[in-house]
């Protein structure tokens, strides 16, 4: 499956060139696609390219170790994520017609091949809508991303993660979504995490995790203060109501090198996702920038909350108190 195109002229993916190059992808979409929807297409393409390039690196290592045994190099044990036959970036890049269909099929097949880790991660973008995404536009977009070498050897997780966060902020600025709905300023996140002061091995939960920035900052904090983030494997939990945003959060964590975390889509107040037996799960640390401006937040459900999260809140209190009680239970 791994095929190197010798005609590719990859750019050096340092943080400056990588961030700028990724942002240029938005200009390719500009016009047919609304600015608010840029992230719906650019983030999945970036993640698809990263998966494919890392797969190629793993394939090359296995090939060398096995004395050019191509069958061995494709064994699942040699790859963190599986890419089914015909679903690699290069397979889609070779298409000249119905590119959107090829992209959508490849992404869905990759999700199905990695059900425990990548289910639904590419979101619900309408890649086959040719009124919005013509073959010519998608071809330009594919070629633009193909100039990037996004394997671990050329693009370390911290560099790619910084570029990804740069895009998140740019998209938030572009659509004026700054008030916690999509993006919380990095300085605010850093301050909140310093106040929280999580320790290695503690579980950390963000019930309104957005794009995952607070969980990532908590992970960085633990690594900075304890020197090793391996004790945080399986310790990060988040829930996000918006489908696209929850997918972005998962991609964000993966691209930063996080190896084991739990991000679920759903309404934290109406349908909490994490349980311990018949009760809601509890966590060592809870951090969030909740959507306080939300109008229809589920008061009808909270009046008779089956988990007792309103036991300390009078019925006439504001949703701010109810959200707080959700954190404290």
Labelled PLM ranges:
Residues 1-200, 262-273:
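Non-catalytic, mostly N-terminal accessory regions of nucleic-acid modification and defense proteins
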Residues 8, 131, 153, 208, ...:
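Hydrophobic alpha-helical scaffolding
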Residues 178-288, 292-304:
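Conserved S-adenosyl-L-methionine
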Residues 292-328:
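Mobile active-site "lid"/loop adjacent to the S-adenosyl-L-methionine
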């Amino acid at each position: 499956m791994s095929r190197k195109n010798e005609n590719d002229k990859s750019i050096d993916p340092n943080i400056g060139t990588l961030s700028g190059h990724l942002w240029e992808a938005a200009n390719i979409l500009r016009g047919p696609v609304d600015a608010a929807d840029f992230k719906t297409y650019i983030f999945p393409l970036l993640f698809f390219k990263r998966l494919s390039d890392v797969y190629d690196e793993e394939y090359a290592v296995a090939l060398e170790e096995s004395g050019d045994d191509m069958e061995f190099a494709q064994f699942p044990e040699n790859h963190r994520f599986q890419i089914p036959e015909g679903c690699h970036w290069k397979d889609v890049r070779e298409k000249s017609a119905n590119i959107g269909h090829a992209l959508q099929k490849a992404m869905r097949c990759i999700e199905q091949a990695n059900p425990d880790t990548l289910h639904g991660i590419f979101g619900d973008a309408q890649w086959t809508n040719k009124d919005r995404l013509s073959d010519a536009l998608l071809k330009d977009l594919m070629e633009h991303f193909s100039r990037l070498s996004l394997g671990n050897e050329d693009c370390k997780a911290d560099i790619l993660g910084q570029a990804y966060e740069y895009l998140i902020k740019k998209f938030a600025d572009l659509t004026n979504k700054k008030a916690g709905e999509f993006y919380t300023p990095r300085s605010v996140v850093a301050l909140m995490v310093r106040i929280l002061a999580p320790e290695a091995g503690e579980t950390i939960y963000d019930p309104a995790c957005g794009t995952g920035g607070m969980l990532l900052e908590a992970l960085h904090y633990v690594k900075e203060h304890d020197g090793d983030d391996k004790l945080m494997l399986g310790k990060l939990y988040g829930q996000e109501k918006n489908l696209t945003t929850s997918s972005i959060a998962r991609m964000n964590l993966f691209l930063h090198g996080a190896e084991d975390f739990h991000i679920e889509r759903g309404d934290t107040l109406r349908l909490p996702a994490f349980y311990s037996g018949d009760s809601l799960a509890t966590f060592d640390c809870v951090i969030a920038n909740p959507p306080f401006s939300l109008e229809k937040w589920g008061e009808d459900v909270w009046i008779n909350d089956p988990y007792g999260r309103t036991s300390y809140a009078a019925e006439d209190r504001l949703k701010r108190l109810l959200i707080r009680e959700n954190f404290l239970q």
